[in-house]
């Protein structure tokens, strides 16, 4: 039987430690916090590998055998009802592989939704609940935390993009969650977030409910040399390698951010290049191919913007990481008015085209940034 070879440079998800690069110290620290019954606020820019680290931690023997591990991403949630929906769905997905007794106990705790849970032809539960079925999010949240308290194993719950709850219309969500978490001794949480300023406020401001509730962890880019060795370890299995010069170019082109490096390495792994040693030109070719693949999606994305908003976005892309968008130099260089920039920046931030972090503005999508710079 022909075995399909797995591309070792994963872009999404987690397979096993073989396909996970480094993070030895971070994994040990996160595991130690969780096994010592501490909650953790994990703060780092998007696509640097927070979710991968969480899954890698959950894979550790001392974690996976002793805990129920649950991961949810709440980036797209808009209110408490959608949060509770995502949490319930995530719990069921984590418990289903563990057998009927385990998931049935959870479903029996959800009295408010019992009539809306369906089963497939094999008798396995399906999360057929609609968001509209959750009439009382607070009641369902109570039921979920009752499950956490009574579960047969302690639970570890990772909530990705946790800062999203600060934008919910219900203004007491932070306090509501904090109170329940504080009173639940059989569950511990990883609060993962990419908007560093918002996450820092949530966990270090005296006026916020989660003040001093968690150990705070940050993530830095993976060491360049370590990453190069990881890349060549896998490339060697197909009799290829990437030169140190080419990898350094790739690493710094994307500021060491894992997802973009993985994306290009994924393409290089299946490259039609005849060279055994992949060089800078191979990296450039892959990046150009990726931008070409994304072209129509980016055109549709930019169609949502007004001409002035697009003009400001292109200016930020061209500057790279400007610290001031209101300086006379910036306004004059790109022929922009102060009021135009103010209005555009507000929209671009709200729609996640750009981010403002540590005093600088950047495009959230580095491929889009390169694409816009090429247009000019």
Task: Place the predicted regions along the sequence by residue.
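Short, locally clustered residues in the helix-turn-helix/winged-helix DNA-binding domain
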Residues: 34-35, 163, 255, 269, ...
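P-loop NTPase nucleotide-binding core
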Residues: 38-39, 43-48, 52-156
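Conserved C-terminal helix/linker of AAA+ ATPases
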Residues: 270-293
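Helix-loop-helix "sensor" segment of P-loop NTPases
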Residues: 201-252, 274-276
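A short, basic N-terminal segment
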Residues: 1-40, 45, 355
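Conserved Walker B catalytic segment
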Residues: 127-196, 204
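C-terminal helical "lid" of AAA+/P-loop NTPase domains
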Residues: 247-253, 259-273, 311-314, 346
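C-terminal leucine-rich, beta-strand-based interaction scaffolds used for sensing/assembly
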Residues: 2, 6-7, 292, 296-376
């Amino acid at each position: 039987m022909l075995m399909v070879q797995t591309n070792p440079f994963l872009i999404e998800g987690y397979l096993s430690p073989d396909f996970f690069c480094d993070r030895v110290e971070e994994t040990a620290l996160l595991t130690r916090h969780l096994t010592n019954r501490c909650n953790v606020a994990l703060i780092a820019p998007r696509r640097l590998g927070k979710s991968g680290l969480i899954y890698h931690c959950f894979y550790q023997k001392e974690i996976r055998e002793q805990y129920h591990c649950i991961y949810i991403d709440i980036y797209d949630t808009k209110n408490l009802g959608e949060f509770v929906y995502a949490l319930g769905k995530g719990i069921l997905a984590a418990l289903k592989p563990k057998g009927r007794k385990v998931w049935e106990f959870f479903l029996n705790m959800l009295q408010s939704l019992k009539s809306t849970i369906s089963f497939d032809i094999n008798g396995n539960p399906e999360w057929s609940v609609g968001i509209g079925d959750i009439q009382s999010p607070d009641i369902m949240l109570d039921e979920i935390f009752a499950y956490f308290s009574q579960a047969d194993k302690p639970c570890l719950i990772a909530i990705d993009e946790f800062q999203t709850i600060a934008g919910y219309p219900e203004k007491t969500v932070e306090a509501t969650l904090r109170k329940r978490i504080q009173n639940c001794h059989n569950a511990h949480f990883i609060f993962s977030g990419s908007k560093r300023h918002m996450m820092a406020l949530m966990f270090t401001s005296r006026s916020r409910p989660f003040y001093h509730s968690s150990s705070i962890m940050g993530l830095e880019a993976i060491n360049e040399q370590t990453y190069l060795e990881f890349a060549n370890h896998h490339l060697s299995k197909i009799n290829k390698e990437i030169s140190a010069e080419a990898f350094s170019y790739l690493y710094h082109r994307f500021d060491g951010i894992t997802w973009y490096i993985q994306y290009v390495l994924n393409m290089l792994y299946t490259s039609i290049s005849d060279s055994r040693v992949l060089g800078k030109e191979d990296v450039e070719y892959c990046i150009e191919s990726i931008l070409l693949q994304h072209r129509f999606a980016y055109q549709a994305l930019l169609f949502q913007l007004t001409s002035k908003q697009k003009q400001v976005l292109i200016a930020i892309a061209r500057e790279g990481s400007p610290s001031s968008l209101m300086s006379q130099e910036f306004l004059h260089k790109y022929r922009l008015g102060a009021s135009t920039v103010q209005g555009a920046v507000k929209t671009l931030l709200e729609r996640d085209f750009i981010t403002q972090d540590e005093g600088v503005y950047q495009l959230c999508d580095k491929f889009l940034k390169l694409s816009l710079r090429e247009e000019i």
